[in-house]
Amino acid sequence: MNIKELTYYIQSANINFLIGSGASRPYLATLGSIEKLLTRLNDDMTSHFEPKYKIAEASIYKAFYDSVIAPNRLYHKSGDDYSETKKNYQNYLITWNSLLNKRHSRILKKQLNTFTTNIDLMIEDAANGMGIELNDGFRGSINPIYDEANFMKSIMQTSIHFQHTSEIPVFNLLKIHGSINWSGYNNHIVHERFWSYYVDEEIKKMGDDRFVNLFNIGSDGRKTEKTYEQIIEGAEELELLYEASEYDAFITEYKKFIIVNPTKRKFAE
């Protein structure tokens, strides 16, 4: 495809992107083996429940929380990996904002749909302060509520001196696996300002030692992922020290996130 053909499609077609977890690298981890671990664990828990499985479940959730969810906290964001990831998202927004501004068609809106399976807040963070319209589907200021009708709106800009009206580019962000800052309230999805607080508190109460570490640490300091069998063995050892019910509060708070957890069942969800 040459530049002329590409220009034609940009000018005359609806523009949609689908981005996955790799877009938030290197700052946030990809799923790795977590999806396979949770899928197998869910199958075992469905066929016959044992306390060790609850401990393993909590441990895998914590590993996912530590690597993908917790780094989105405001005070956590720093370092070269964060800067690189944020810059990549900003380049995406700047480039397409410029292209949409140059769209000549009056039939098509100056909108771009970004569908993402990511539950993180990196693209929202990147857009903050850029002067770019990122529509995440929420309406309202004090207690924003998610409303899909929001994606059908256009934003117009009027010149102060000549009363000339023009449409400005809008990026619609559709998070098809949910988001870590979504919460349920009165049958609505609302913004949760303190999304990490309650899970963090449960982890502090329990301590890291009550969770199975999903990695083996070699003598050289290198980490290798544990197998499913090794994780279950670790859960069996913890079962001798702690009651499985002690993990209930953490699991309950974690499951309040309105997200599709990384298992093969996510395709059904």
Please annotate each region the language model reported.
Residues 89, 268-269:
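A conditional alpha-helix N-cap/helix-loop micro-motif detector
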Residues 108-267:
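Extended, H/D-rich, highly charged conserved domains that either
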Residues 1-139, 143, 166-169, 174-177, ...:
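Gly/serine-rich nucleotide phosphate-binding loop at the start of the catalytic core
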